[in-house]
Design a protein with these regions (language model features):
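C-terminal active-site "lid" helix and adjoining low-complexity regulatory extension at the edge
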Residues: 73-75, 84-134
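Residues in well-ordered beta-strands of folded domains
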Residues: 3, 62-64, 133
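ATP-dependent carboxylate/phosphate-activation module, predominantly the ATP-grasp catalytic core
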Residues: 1-45, 83-109
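A long amphipathic alpha-helix within ATP-dependent nucleotide-binding catalytic cores
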Residues: 13-74, 113-128
Length: 134
């Protein structure tokens, strides 16, 4: 599934918790989601062949939207890194709401020598919320 997340200084800081349809709707503001779906299918096919009989387990692929040089358009960077392990994206997916539950933000901060996971309910819905507020 999709995980829309934010980082600060190359460190994961939080995720949007919403249904897959809502996340696709959110991303459609920035990119053509049919391209995202095609990229996901291609990566799935390629990794299935590459990892056959070599790895069984969870994995996550970090993608990113990047500004195209000289324009205000965004493009998909299809593979920043592949994590052959459980990721914070898996945690976000397991905490994502059903279509009948409110959308949330999951954030992680570090204070007083410990990490803290927090869930914030969105009253106005994900599509009206800036990802920058994570």
């Amino acid at each position: 599934g999709l995980s829309i997340f934010k980082t600060s200084k190359r460190t994961y800081t939080g995720s949007l918790l919403a249904t897959e349809d809502t996340k696709l709707e959110y991303l459609s503001q920035y990119i053509d989601v049919s391209i995202l779906k095609a990229v996901a299918e291609t990566i799935t096919t390629m990794l299935s062949a590459l990892l056959l009989n070599k790895y069984v387990g969870p994995l996550g692929i970090d993608m990113m939207l990047v500004k195209q040089e000289g324009t205000n358009n965004l493009a998909i960077h299809p593979c920043v890194e592949i994590n052959l392990r459980r990721t914070m994206g898996h945690v976000a997916l397991s905490l994502s709401p059903s279509p009948l539950e409110p959308q949330r933000l999951m954030s992680i901060d570090h204070s007083r020598g410990a990490y803290h996971l927090r869930l914030h309910t969105l009253n106005d819905g994900l599509l009206n919320t800036s990802i920058a507020r994570l």
